[in-house]
């Protein structure tokens, strides 16, 4: 699949920019009713094409060991037409501000254009069906998971990645403003 090279590149970008650390975060794309997803407990900065897990839309494993957040990905794909990629990170500022009960405001033209509106989900245990169900109820393309991280969805992987970058930048700006 041609998109796997881009998939790996995006995973490495996320790791290099510290949007994910350790084995946190995960990425997936949907193609022809198959989900290509990062493996469980993987370091995104070091994965290669052979590591990518593949599942069908019912969660049946075709190849590899998918992320423990698989059901969050599956639920989003099932409920959101037009979503073909998901990026879930534990980006520092995007995670920290909501922990301190600070709102992340869309302060720049770029953030208003690309993010439009931010969704929020209360804290649910990571890897839980409750979290998967709550996230999939949201219709925003950027969703803050309280005390956990963010989920960005897009029509393709570059779109979801762009939203991740813009979200972290606007979160950094919000942090600076809250600090003044």
From Swiss-Prot:
Top-level taxonomic group: Archaea
Annotated residues for binding of Zn(2+): 69, 88, 90, 148
Annotated active site: 69 (proton donor/acceptor)
Catalytic activity: L-fuculose 1-phosphate = (S)-lactaldehyde + dihydroxyacetone phosphate
EC numbers: 4.1.2.17
Gene Ontology MF, one: zinc ion binding
GO biological process, one term: pentose catabolic process
Pfam families in the record: Aldolase_II
Required cofactor names: Zn(2+)
Entry's Gene Ontology cellular component terms: cytosol
Record carries keyword Metal-binding: yes
Chain positions recorded as substrate binding sites: 25-26, 40-41, 67-68
InterPro entries, sorted: Aldolase_class_II_sugar_metab, Aldolase_II/adducin_N, Aldolase_II/adducin_N_sf, Fuculose-P_aldolase
Xref: Gene3D superfamilies: Class II aldolase/adducin N-terminal domain
Pathway(s) per entry: Cofactor biosynthesis; coenzyme F420 biosynthesis
Assembly: Homotetramer.
Name of the featured protein: L-fuculose phosphate aldolase
Organism from which the protein derives: Methanococcus aeolicus (strain ATCC BAA-1280 / DSM 17508 / OCM 812 / Nankai-3)
Gene that this sequence comes from: fucA
């Amino acid at each position: 699949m041609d998109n796997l090279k881009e998939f790996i590149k995006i995973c490495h970008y996320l790791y290099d920019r510290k949007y994910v650390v350790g084995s946190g975060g995960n990425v997936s794309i949907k193609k022809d009713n198959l989900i290509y997803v990062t493996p469980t407990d993987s370091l995104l900065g070091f994965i290669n094409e052979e590591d990518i897990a593949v599942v069908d839309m019912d969660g049946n494993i075709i190849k590899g060991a998918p992320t423990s957040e698989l059901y969050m990905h599956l639920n989003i794909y099932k409920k959101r037409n037009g979503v073909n990629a998901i990026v879930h990170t534990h980006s520092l500022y995007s995670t920290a501000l909501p922990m301190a009960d600070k709102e992340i405001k869309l302060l720049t033209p770029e953030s208003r254009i690309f993010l439009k509106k931010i969704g929020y989900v209360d804290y649910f245990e990571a890897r839980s069906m409750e979290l998967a169900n709550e996230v999939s109820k949201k219709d925003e393309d950027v969703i803050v998971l309280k005390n956990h991280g963010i989920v960005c969805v897009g029509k393709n992987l570059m779109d979801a990645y762009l939203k991740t970058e813009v979200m972290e930048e606007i979160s950094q700006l919000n942090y600076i403003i809250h600090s003044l």
